[in-house]
Curated annotation (Swiss-Prot):
Pfam families: Med15_C (PF21539), Med15_M (PF21538), Med15_N (PF09606). It comes from Homo sapiens (Human). Residues 493-503, 511-529 have a biased composition (Polar residues). InterPro entries: KIX_dom_sf (IPR036529), Med15_C (IPR048386), Med15_central (IPR048385), Med15_N (IPR019087). PANTHER family: MEDIATOR OF RNA POLYMERASE II TRANSCRIPTION SUBUNIT 15. Residues 9-73 are annotated as: Interaction with SREBF1. Residues 270-284, 447-459 have a biased composition (Pro residues). The keyword Endoplasmic reticulum does not apply. Residues 95-139, 260-329, 412-530 are annotated as: Disordered. This is Mediator of RNA polymerase II transcription subunit 15. The gene is MED15. Residues 260-269, 285-294, 309-329, 426-446, 460-482 have a biased composition (Low complexity). Component of the Mediator complex, a coactivator involved in the regulated transcription of nearly all RNA polymerase II-dependent genes. Mediator functions as a bridge to convey information from gene-specific regulatory proteins to the basal RNA polymerase II transcription machinery. Mediator is recruited to promoters by direct interactions with regulatory proteins and serves as a scaffold for the assembly of a functional preinitiation complex with RNA polymerase II and the general transcription factors. Required for cholesterol-dependent gene regulation.
Amino acid sequence: MDVSGQETDWRSTAFRQKLVSQIEDAMRKAGVAHSKSSKDMESHVFLKAKTRDEYLSLVARLIIHFRDIHNKKSQASVSDPMNALQSLTGGPAAGAAGIGMPPRGPGQSLGGMGSLGAMGQPMSLSGQPPPGTSGMAPHSMAVVSTATPQTQLQLQQVALQQQQQQQQFQQQQQAALQQQQQQQQQQQFQAQQSAMQQQFQAVVQQQQQLQQQQQQQQHLIKLHHQNQQQIQQQQQQLQRIAQLQLQQQQQQQQQQQQQQQQALQAQPPIQQPPMQQPQPPPSQALPQQLQQMHHTQHHQPPPQPQQPPVAQNQPSQLPPQSQTQPLVSQAQALPGQMLYTQPPLKFVRAPMVVQQPPVQPQVQQQQTAVQTAQAAQMVAPGVQMITEALAQGGMHIRARFPPTTAVSAIPSSSIPLGRQPMAQVSQSSLPMLSSPSPGQQVQTPQSMPPPPQPSPQPGQPSSQPNSNVSSGPAPSPSSFLPSPSPQPSQSPVTARTPQNFSVPSPGPLNTPVNPSSVMSPAGSSQAEEQQYLDKLKQLSKYIEPLRRMINKIDKNEDRKKDLSKMKSLLDILTDPSKRCPLKTLQKCEIALEKLKNDMAVPTPPPPPVPPTKQQYLCQPLLDAVLANIRSPVFNHSLYRTFVPAMTAIHGPPITAPVVCTRKRRLEDDERQSIPSVLQGEVARLDPKFLVNLDPSHCSNNGTVHLICKLDDKDLPSVPPLELSVPADYPAQSPLWIDRQWQYDANPFLQSVHRCMTSRLLQLPDKHSVTALLNTWAQSVHQACLSAA
C-alpha cells in the first residue's frame, strides 16, 4: 500500500470538506448554538495537528463532544414517559442516523459478536475511516440507537419502578449498539483483509527477488573460488620455474664473482661516489623487453566482473564500490603469497662489505642484467596471466613476503577494492621482474595509487611513482623485485647493504604526511617544486584581500557559491598540507586576477597621496571634531587633550582674585533683617512643614519671602506654598502668593486651590504663619476626601 499517499491525502481540500460536513451535521443534531462555525473548528484542528492520525482523533473528539450533548438532551427528555415513547416510536436516534446504520429489531441475531468483538479499532492499513466514525474506535462513540418495542415498555416503567429496571434498559441499549458496531467491524475487517492480501503479495514478490539475488551472489562466489584455485596453480608453476632459474643463476654468478674477486684483489680500491652510479644500457633495456613480451604473450579473456559476496539475509544488493570487506578470508591462501612460501634462499647481512671495493656493483650489474632478462622471459607469461586476472577482477592483494626471500612480493601498498579504477592497469604497465642492481631504475605504472603510508621505513625505498629504487633488502612498494643477489651467504661479495650502493630517489624520503602531496615525475620534480613555491609566494599578496572579501560576504546568502570558491582558494594559499598541481595553481592565479577589482573595492590599500596645496593641514582634526561634536564627553576630551599644550605655550590664565566680603556682609544683613518673632515661630512649626527663604527675592524693605513645603506621609505631594511676611509682622498678617498656573495641571490640584481660597476667606484679619500653613494642610486633606 502507498503509505505516502495516506500521509498526504488528509491535507487535501476534499477530505477536509468531508470532515467539515460531519462536524456541521453533529452540531445541527446537537442543537447547540456556538460562536464558531464548523469550518472554523476544522481549520483550528488542522493547524494544530501534525499527522493524519492526530488530525482524525481531534476531529472525532469534536464530533463525540456534540453527540454527548445530544445524548444528554435525549436522556433528559426520557424522564417524561410520553416524550420518551414519542421519541422512540418516531424513528432512529440521532446517533444512529449520524452513523448511517439502519434500526435493528429485537429479533435480529447477535451471533458472531464474540469473534468480531476483538476487532477493537480499525487497522491503519485501510484508506480513510468511515464517515460516521471519523477515525475513532467504534466503542468510543456514544451513540443512541433505536429502541425495540420491548424497550418501549421498559421506558414507560422508568418513572414508576426501581433503579434495577433502568439498568436492564441500559443493557438492551448496549446490545443494540453492539449490533451496529458488529456491522461496522465486518465492513472494516473485509477492507483490511483485502489490503493485507495485497501487502502479502508484495512481500512474497520481494522475497522471490531476494532469493534470486542470493542465488546470483552464490554463483559469483563459486566463480571467485575457482579463479583463486587457478591462480594458486599458476603460482606453483611460477615457483618451480623461478627456483630452476635461480639455481642456474647462482652457479654462474659464483664462478664470475670468484674470477672478479681474484682479478680485483690486485687493484687498489677506486673511490667513487656511491650516490651517482650511471645506469648501464642493459638495465635500461629491461622494461622495453618486458613490455614487448607482455604484448606478444597470449591474452587471457578477462573474467567476469566480480561482485563482493552479500549475506543472504541482506535486503538489497549493495554496489561493489561501497563494499570494503576483503573478498578472501585469511584462512584461504591469498594470491599475494606467491612465489616462495618456504624461504630456502636467504641472505645473511654480514658486515663484510668493507672488504669489497666499490667498483663491483657496476661490473656485476652488467653481467647479471642479461641473465635476469632471460629469467624474466620465462616468468613473464605466468606473471602476465596473474596480473591480468588481478587487475580486471579488482581483487584485494597485499604482499606478505619477508624482506629476505629470493623473489619479492606484490607492492606493499594495498590496492583498494572497487574504489580505484582497476581497468587502468594495462598489459604494458605490469611490474617487472629484474635484479635491483644499485644503478637500476625501476619504472612503475602511473595508474598505481600512492601507498597509504606517508614516510617509508628505513629499509624501504621511497614509495613515489617513477622513483629510483635503492638496492635495499626490502621489496619495492610497487614492483615485483627479487632480493638483491640470490647467492648463498658464504660469498662475501654478495652481502651488500643499502648504505654503500644506492641511487637517490628524486624526491626526499621524508615525504609529506598528506599522500596527495607526492610530487609526480621524477626528472623535473625539483624544478616544479621550486616553481610551485615561487608561484605560491607570488600569490601570497592575495591572502589578506581574500580574507577581507570572505568576511564581507560571509552573511550574504546570495553569494554562497562564490564564498565556497573563495574559501577553497584561501585554503590552497594558506594551508601547506593542501598541495595541488602547478596547473591548478595557475588557474587559481587567473581567478584571483578576476577578483582583484572586487577585493580592492571594500578596503583599498591607502595610496601614497602627495600633499597638495588644496588639502588643508588640519583637515583630519576638523573631521574628527565634526564626527564627535555631539558626544556628551567631547568638551571634557578637548579640555584634557589641548589644555596641557596651551598651558605650556601661553602659561597659566591670568584671573583676578575673588573678593567675597561684600556678599558675606549682605548675608549678615539679611539674617539680621528676619524678625526674631518669625524665627521662633518657624522653629516651633510642625515637622511636616519645611520652611526656607526664597533665594530669588531680596528684602530691601524688610519683607521676608518664604517657601513652604508639605512633607506628610499621609498626604500627596502638592506645589510649595509661597508666603510674603511683612516687616512689621505680627502687626500685619502674612500674604499667600497665589501661583494659580501651578494648580491647573489636574483636577485634584484645582480642588486644592478652591479649598485653600475658601478657607482663607474664613480666617480672621490678623492671623499667623502657623494658621496659614495649617489651613493649607487642611485644604489638601479636604481635596483628598472629596476625590475619594
